[in-house]
């Protein structure tokens, strides 16, 4: 199937041309595969820069009146009705796109997406879901920044979404998956009152599939397939993990074998998925460089082609008990 993907050129910490270069690399790498139709959203000054590129013949460019900056408040972002982010989400909502990718302001993207894109029925709150490499493959962790403070019911919703996501990508419909609650210790009594209540609810709902509390170090061991956490803790965990990998890559350099670098390179995974929406929205890190943008865009294509949001909706209904 042809995938129609929208990309927000604006709002990240990088130059918009970095996104443009990543798009070119994705198009080159996908030669011979099923076609991909890109639509990019950029301000007029960036649009003029892109028109001289040979790539402009292969990519549709939509001119935006403005863009959402990292410094914009939510109110300011919402008021920018013709921003690159808003226009991209409008096109997604209208069915003109199969997915939308942005590396802009996270809070603005989540808020605008939630206001424009219908939620999957029975999902209490959206969450940012990201894949992280482990010794046994990969795990998904959510939430990593959509909502700072959540209640136990919402955490259970995250668990169901994470399970539905893993199930939707599995070729084996009966494959078992395990869950863990990110906490300051593995003992049941650890954590806040909210964590303790969430622990009890997850144990009652998921039974033996819930392996209890896990500490940050357990995530990379592959002990569990789905890690449940609130957006504040999850975001701190994710940025710490990314920073540690970058530190090791810088310190060890060429002494790290390529296969090891690839195994623990978070940039080869898609960006964070705003899970819970009925349409695909991917948030790339604002500081994403070319490789991470390539991974985010390529991953978005794969997820759109797999119709992952519809499959999550189907699976989510099965997981509500």
Swiss-Prot record:
Belongs to the PlsX family. It is found in: Cytoplasm. It comes from the Bacteria. One of its GO terms (cellular component) is cytoplasm. GO terms for biological process: fatty acid biosynthetic process; phospholipid biosynthetic process. Homodimer. Probably interacts with PlsY. Keywords: Cytoplasm, Lipid biosynthesis, Lipid metabolism, Phospholipid biosynthesis, Phospholipid metabolism, Transferase. Its EC number is 2.3.1.274. This is Phosphate acyltransferase. Catalyzes the reversible formation of acyl-phosphate (acyl-PO(4)) from acyl-[acyl-carrier-protein] (acyl-ACP). This enzyme utilizes acyl-ACP as fatty acyl donor, but not acyl-CoA. Its main location: cytoplasm. One of its GO terms (molecular function) is phosphate:acyl-[acyl carrier protein] acyltransferase activity. Pathway: Lipid metabolism; phospholipid metabolism. It comes from Chlamydia trachomatis serovar D (strain ATCC VR-885 / DSM 19411 / UW-3/Cx). It is an enzyme of class 2 (transferase). The gene is plsX. It catalyses: a fatty acyl-[ACP] + phosphate = an acyl phosphate + holo-[ACP]. InterPro entries: FA_synthesis (IPR003664), Phospholipid_synth_PlsX-like (IPR012281). The lineage of its organism: Bacteria, Pseudomonadati, Chlamydiota, Chlamydiia, Chlamydiales. It holds the Pfam family FA_synthesis.
